[in-house]
């Protein structure tokens, strides 16, 4: 295929290919190499047809992939993550964007006010709720763009937003993995050459103090980063390393090689120790009564630098001096921190974005990024902090609590990684044609520092213990839950409280999780549940939604409907209000034989159940069952009953209570938590053609 030699993209591709081939053999003639590359391009180049659709003007045009790519270079539309193109902000006013910016600015203002209050105070909580509502308002616009009933609906906006967010978060994720964990893999030799091209053009002057690296050292390191082993690749990598200068080999070797860069260069490790030495160690106070004595104890503190002359003002000053906010380092270390950051940005960080970074999120092993949420990367820095503490600080705690030293080291790393995140996101923004005056709006801030984190098996499910929030110390170290079912409305308040107690007592408080202690506690709790049910206490039972039967296409399939109707049949003078949230009790009264005991002891109840349930004509207690080519109705019997708050399970029904299923259902919300600790479960209970009482039972078996 004949290639367009005036194409911007084609020329960029050829230029990079020529540079790569010359790295294999610098003695080659550059003009001849370029002609060779052009010839290969003509032989291999593919330019598929594409369709351009403008859903605002209802225009559709045909083109080729290359023509579209070159058009984006010339006209610079905003490029979304799924290939949707938008008119640039400097070409037309976007009222919706302004609306979102105003909402987010309001949120930022509320958060700033929130952090002036004492964490946990009513004022703090109220402002936290308000800023959260602003966030939901902004997010609701995104939801509206995907709803056809919304004024904001656009068939491309929703996917464009979703996939752009994926691109942004995966851009940061791959950078974090590469920079902090040296976890970068090249899927082929072309990607390695592309990365080398970026690295060798990143620093204009390479300093002489960088440690010299041999050809073998660099070659082995680069080859270890290849996704697959290949002798031909190994030979090519060695030839490239041979043709690099001594300075270039050093530059390439230390890129993404953070720990080795620190350990090999005394001037870098000295900067880290100097930062720790020069932090002022001050104590926080609990009340305003302690303020005057603390000022007397520290006459070197200028009271004019305090925001207020009370405990809040003092503690704010202390937290800044202890470097608890990586975005606001104290003056005592600022120069050293900036210097260290420049070295790390120049000689460790690489401004590189893998083309398949979204794919890598799900398919490549991670070493640093523990959890990826909608707009968050949660990083594990424990390994780096431990290494610096042992090998750079050599155990010196500088006469302060070791926890504060960990905060200092974490925030020293975070100061650097924040700069790296800003750089890679600014680069992504420029590639996406964001106007220069808008560069920087896309950013990633350091919001939380977790002391502990437990990650569930399902996506976006985790338990954390928070120490810092945007540089503010929360001395209570609260436990936060995300994604687990037990914090949802279907779990009773008593069970939610019990599970939180288990998590705090056996997972958060101990140095290592006490799995055996948790399982023993659960066994004792099972007996308490049985006793409470028998004595009329229903606080542990799961909650269901009691709604009108007209709200369901198949009401008989809803346990809440069957259970509510059964209660109302037995208690016509005390019916369950609709809608409401009664307690759900599992039963095992599948056949008339199961309720035979009622004939003599509870004859009126027996007659009602025979008529209204086992000879049901409403369809609530029956289900269609296929027999050959025909369908017949089969009775589901009594497999559940709803009990409103403040009422007891009817005495006649008590012998039918399925305690095992009830206990397993009550404890079901804790199973995902136990799975984190390796605790296994197995299915128990009956399944009939008309009902399913199968539940998962917790065992004392642990998977290693």
Segments from the language model and where they lie:
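Conserved acidic
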Residues: 1-704
